[in-house]
A protein has these predicted regions:
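Conserved small/polar residues in nucleotide/adenosyl-binding loops
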Residues: 145-147
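Clamp-loader machinery-focused feature within the broader ASCE/P-loop NTPase space
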Residues: 2-141
């Protein structure tokens, strides 16, 4: 995934890329809706999980890691979004065990999604590199805090 559609994100992408060797435990990427924050986060996750980055450090788009990211199936990346966004963006979504198929798609990130991350975060990376968890939009997590 290239950020060529979002030239205004080049500076933010460069700052993220400069941190890739000494990453903190979490990075909060924020911006107005529609400016490409999700795309920037996906690009950076792909950059971290790329097995053959280009000379400029950008993801190659061709290695197994990049292909798995494009197919939304990289074993070392989890994308946590609402059921509504998962449907709109064609992302994987696992409904809670008590879910009924006739209900309206949830626009909130649900607690069962974070509980499902426990096993993922305690295991070693499958491909030997890093693991990434993208939570989008992060402000949807606040509704969990008030439960």
């Amino acid at each position: 995934m290239a950020l060529t559609q979002y030239p205004w994100l080049e500076e933010a992408a460069a700052r993220l890329d400069a941190m890739r060797e000494r990453l903190p435990n979490a990075i909060l990427i924020h911006g107005m809706p529609g400016v490409g924050t999700f795309e920037l986060a996906r690009w950076f996750a792909e950059r971290l999980l790329c097995e053959s980055p280009k000379a400029d450090g950008s993801p190659c788009g061709k290695c197994p890691g990049c292909r798995m990211m494009h197919a939304n199936g990289h074993p070392d990346c989890r994308i946590v979004v609402s059921e509504f966004l998962a449907n709109a963006l064609d992302l994987p979504y696992t409904p809670p065990e008590t879910s009924s198929s006739s209900k309206k798609l949830s626009r909130e990130i649900r607690i069962h999604q974070f509980r499902a991350l426990t096993d993922f975060l305690t295991m070693a990376p499958s491909r030997g590199g890093r693991r990434c968890v993208l939570v989008y939009p992060a402000d949807m997590v606040l509704s969990l805090i008030h439960i």
